Swiss-Prot record:
It is found in: Cytoplasm; Cytoplasm, Cytoskeleton, Microtubule organizing center, Centrosome. This is Leucine zipper putative tumor suppressor 2. The lineage of its organism: Eukaryota, Metazoa, Chordata, Craniata, Vertebrata. Belongs to the LZTS2 family. Keywords: Cell cycle, Cell division, Coiled coil, Cytoplasm, Cytoskeleton, Microtubule, Mitosis, Phosphoprotein, Wnt signaling pathway. One of its GO terms (cellular component) is midbody. It comes from Bos taurus (Bovine). Residues 1-25, 187-198, 241-282 have a biased composition (Low complexity). The gene is LZTS2.
């Protein structure tokens, strides 16, 4: 049975590795990790050069081995912050470039590996080394033992070594270049200037010392034991490398510094069944990047991790050859891998011990837990059975109730269908009546509009009649005023006639008195006539002058005086007769004038009475017509209200009884 083990990942850097670069956290060591490159950054293009027996993979974007443009299978590792007091910096982001997928890469294998390794992303899970108890609320990322290892894809080809030693080289073909071109500078011959030749070992040594270790490979086919040493007689990297950049870690060796003591130099993945040195190959990208950014002297990782101050660097020696540099780099990587393998062995032993303890504790707890689970399951089964029986009983009752409800609903449905059929028949029967009613409503609406128009006309006529009535009232007031004036004049005439009657009576009395007096005078005149006739005798006319008068006696004189008195009486009677005739004429004239005035007053009175009667008759006719119009208007309003109530379906109100009141005035 395979055991999954994990390496302890410190949250803070170790004291002895304070100045060393922090490598990404190492994941769980199992056979599920493939040898594909991590998404630290795209790999530079492959440069064709002298083939080597092995290849390197770039982790942070500088070097890549095996497959060039595979999709990443693990999340990108963020760059670590530089520790204060050191001059090491990462330049991984500067050299991260996009590279097109290689035709030799297998995308299907990458997808399968990504699907299998989806649960291994992120930091490694934490195991609880406490015996007897495990966390119950474990997250999805739980370590589980596995007895099988997936078949990992094999690298399609072995790339050349110069393709891992620098960024993308520019040239005519884009894939060929020397080692100096891979380091970023132009290609130069052995006769180049001494300054540029002196800077190359510094850059290479700084690059080799500053880069973190890469990922481990997935097979033992490319082990470090098969790597050639590339040792030549004329190359001495120990003497040519500067002391500040290539410190020696062994007797007589000055290749490259190894990993910092006490802390892992980078993420490593190993299988629980494999511990050979053929598991890992180095990545030179991050280690070479540390020397590209710094041009001055800087402390080595070993000296900075141990707390020692590096001496000032000596003047740069002449540049070594490419084979010597490659030899130094490979020896340094070999030492790094040996230290990593030792650390992996230690962590594997610790993880195996912890996992064995946890497994034994869980084996001891499993019977008790199984018994408790069995009892709990039996109790739950009994409760579930009782609950199910209760639910079955309730469901049976609900079923019977639903059957009763269904039968009742069927009956109601039949009743509703019958009512619906009756409603449809009524609707079909009421259709023609509805049309007739609509036509009647249209006709009545036309009549109503006509009646409204007539009502408006009658209202206008009523207003006109009202104005005429006002004018008639004004005329009536004027006629009454004239009548009062006429009555006053009539009263004055009556008083004048009365006075005239009184005067006439007085005149008639005086006339009667005059008549009586005239009768008396006539009688007296008759007597006097008779006396005068008796006394009148024809006298003897004298022949001469009237000597008789002279000689008459006194008696003759008396007779002659009496005859003179009779003549005066006659004259007075005639005068009185003339006055009587005149008085008679005046009385007749006054009687005629009084009679004419009486006739005129009577005619005026009859005219006023006739005018008042006509005015009263007109007023009564106007009043009756107004009452008739009001009754018609009220009847129309009642009909409209009755129609509205009939449309609304309400009962008609009782008709109101209108009493006509006629008031007549007496003249």
């Amino acid at each position: 049975m395979a055991i999954v083990q994990t390496l302890p990942v410190p949250l803070e850097p170790a004291p002895e590795a304070a100045t060393a670069q922090q490598a990404p956290a190492m994941g769980s060591v199992s056979s599920l990790i493939s040898g594909r490159p991590c998404p630290g950054g795209p790999a530079p293009p492959r440069h064709h050069g002298p083939p080597g027996p092995t290849f390197f993979r770039q982790q942070d974007g500088l070097l890549r081995g095996g497959y060039e443009a595979q999709e990443p299978l693990c999340p990108a590792v963020p760059p670590r912050k530089a520790v204060p007091g050191t001059n090491f910096t990462y330049i991984n982001e500067d050299f991260r470039t996009e590279s097109p997928p290689s035709p030799s890469s297998d995308l299907e294998d990458a997808r399968e590996q990504r699907a299998r390794n989806a649960h291994l992303r992120g930091p490694p899970p934490k195991l609880i080394p406490v015996s007897g108890k495990l966390e119950k609320n474990m997250e999805k990322i739980v370590i589980r033992p596995t007895a099988f290892k997936p078949v990992l894809p094999k690298p399609r080809g072995v790339p050349s070594l110069p393709s891992f030693l620098g960024p993308r080289a520019t040239g005519p073909s884009g894939s060929q270049g020397s080692l100096t071109q891979l380091f970023g500078g132009p290609a130069s011959s052995s006769s180049s200037s001494s300054s540029s030749a002196a800077d190359k070992p510094l850059i290479l040594s700084g690059w080799a010392s500053g880069c973190p270790s890469g990922t481990l490979s997935d097979s033992g086919r490319n082990s470090l034991s098969s790597l050639p040493t590339y040792s030549t007689g004329g190359a001495e990297p120990a003497t040519n490398s500067p002391g500040g950049h290539l410190p020696s870690h062994g007797p007589g060796r000055g290749a490259l510094p190894g990993p910092a003591r006490g802390a892992p130099t980078g993420p490593s993945h190993s299988d629980s069944g494999r511990s050979s040195s053929s598991k890992s190959t180095g990545s030179l990208g991050g280690r070479l990047a540390g020397g590209l950014l710094g041009s001055g002297p800087r402390a080595s990782p070993d000296s900075s991790s141990c707390g020692e101050r590096s001496p000032p660097p000596p003047p740069p020696p002449p540049p070594p050859s490419d084979e010597a540099l490659l030899h130094c780099v490979l020896e340094g990587k070999l030492r790094d891998r040996e230290a990593e393998l030792q650390q992996l062995r230690d962590s594997l032993d610790e993880s195996e011990v912890t996992m064995c303890q946890v497994y034994e504790e869980r084996q001891r707890h499993w019977p008790r837990e199984r018994e408790a689970l069995r009892e709990d399951g039996v109790a739950r089964a009994q409760r579930a059975q009782q609950l199910l029986q209760l639910q079955v009983f309730q469901l049976q009752q609900e079923k019977r109730q639903l059957q009763d409800d269904f039968a009742q609903l069927l009956q109601e449905r039949e009743q509703l269908e019958r009512r619906c059929a009756a409603f449809e028949r009524e609707q079909r029967e009421l259709g023609p009546r509805l049309e007739e009613t609509k036509w009647e409503v249209c006709q009545k609406s036309g009549e109503i509009s006509l009646l409204k128009q007539q009502l408006k006309e009658s209202q206008s006529e009523l207003v006109q009649k009202g104005s005429e009535l006002v004018a008639l009232r004004v005329a009536l007031r004027e006629a009454r005023a004239a009548l009062r004036v006429s009555e006053g004049r009539a009263r004055g005439l009556q008083e004048a006639a009365r006075t005239r009657e009184l005067e006439l009576e007085a005149c008639s009395q005086e006339l009667q008195r005059h008549r009586q007096e005239a009768e008396r005078l006539r009688e007296k005149a008759g007597q006097l006539d008779s006396e005068a006739a008796g006394l009148r005798e024809p006298p003897v006319p004298p022949a001469t002058a009237d000597p008789f008068l002279l000689a008459e006696s006194d008696e003759a004189k008396a007779q002659r005086a009496a005859a003179g008195v009779g003549g005066s009486l006659r004259a007075q009677v005639e005068r009185l007769r003339a006055e009587l005739q005149r008085e008679r004429r005046q009385g007749e004239e006054q009687r005629d004038s009084f009679e004419g005035e009486r006739l005129a007053w009577q005619a005026e009175k009859e005219q006023v009475i006739r005018y008042q009667k006509q005015l009263q008759h007109n007023y009564i006719q106007m009043y009756r017509r107004n009452r008739q119009l009001e009754q018609e208007l009220q009847q129309l309003s009642l009909e409209l209200e009755a129609r509205e109530l009939a449309d609304l379906g309400l009962a008609e109100p009782a008709p109101c009884i209108c009493l006509e009141e006629i008031t007549a005035t007496e003249i």
